[in-house]
Amino acid sequence: MRQADVTRNTSETKIQISINLDGTGKAELASGVPFLDHMLDQIARHGMIDLKVVANGDAHIDDHHTVEDVGITLGQAFAKAVGDKVGITRYGHSYVPLDETLSRIVIDFSGRPGLEFNVPFTRARVGDFDVDLSIEFFRGFVNHAGVTLHIDNLRGINAHHQIETVFKAFGRALRMALAVDPRASGSIPSTKGSL
């Protein structure tokens, strides 16, 4: 069973995350940051991952610590649920459009953290959400999941659409990369024999 429960407690946040990589896209989300919950729902639905997130952060300061720490904890949960990576496809990619916007995600469960984030946001905020926090979320995820992730917004005018297509494409790329390949049963997808 590719599932994990991870808790992260710091002086700034308290995060609890449960995931099931072989789920149906169900999500129970209470991060305290409504726009982040909306984006996490995209990951769950498009990744077919069951996801539960409960977070309490120092929102009286701002949402930075909560968003970043949810990314960190989610990355830890993915690393735990994926385990030794035996039989997974390893690579995933997705293009997702939303009206005028088009974004691309490419991911590699390589064990090597790396993030390329190319999203030329058209405004600084979507409602109360600081768009720069999206890079903090993905940086936290990448560093703790041990993945290489390329995020490119290829075109877009509406900043909400830019972020939403990134998160939808991320979910779909995860789904592809984490799919179990029956032909690779018992093997690790690397010529090195380990990831």
Swiss-Prot record:
<comment type="pathway">
    <text>Amino-acid biosynthesis; L-histidine biosynthesis; L-histidine from 5-phospho-alpha-D-ribose 1-diphosphate: step 6/9.</text>
</comment>
<dbReference type="InterPro" id="IPR020568">
    <property type="entry name" value="Ribosomal_Su5_D2-typ_SF"/>
</dbReference>
<dbReference type="GO" id="GO:0005737">
    <property type="term" value="C:cytoplasm"/>
</dbReference>
<keyword id="KW-0028">Amino-acid biosynthesis</keyword>
<keyword id="KW-0368">Histidine biosynthesis</keyword>
<dbReference type="InterPro" id="IPR020565">
    <property type="entry name" value="ImidazoleglycerP_deHydtase_CS"/>
</dbReference>
<keyword id="KW-0963">Cytoplasm</keyword>
<dbReference type="InterPro" id="IPR000807">
    <property type="entry name" value="ImidazoleglycerolP_deHydtase"/>
</dbReference>
<dbReference type="GO" id="GO:0000105">
    <property type="term" value="P:L-histidine biosynthetic process"/>
</dbReference>
<dbReference type="GO" id="GO:0004424">
    <property type="term" value="F:imidazoleglycerol-phosphate dehydratase activity"/>
</dbReference>
<dbReference type="Pfam" id="PF00475">
    <property type="entry name" value="IGPD"/>
</dbReference>
<keyword id="KW-0456">Lyase</keyword>
<dbReference type="InterPro" id="IPR038494">
    <property type="entry name" value="IGPD_sf"/>
</dbReference>
<protein>
    <recommendedName>
        <fullName>Imidazoleglycerol-phosphate dehydratase</fullName>
        <ecNumber>4.2.1.19</ecNumber>
    </recommendedName>
</protein>
<comment type="similarity">
    <text>Belongs to the imidazoleglycerol-phosphate dehydratase family.</text>
</comment>
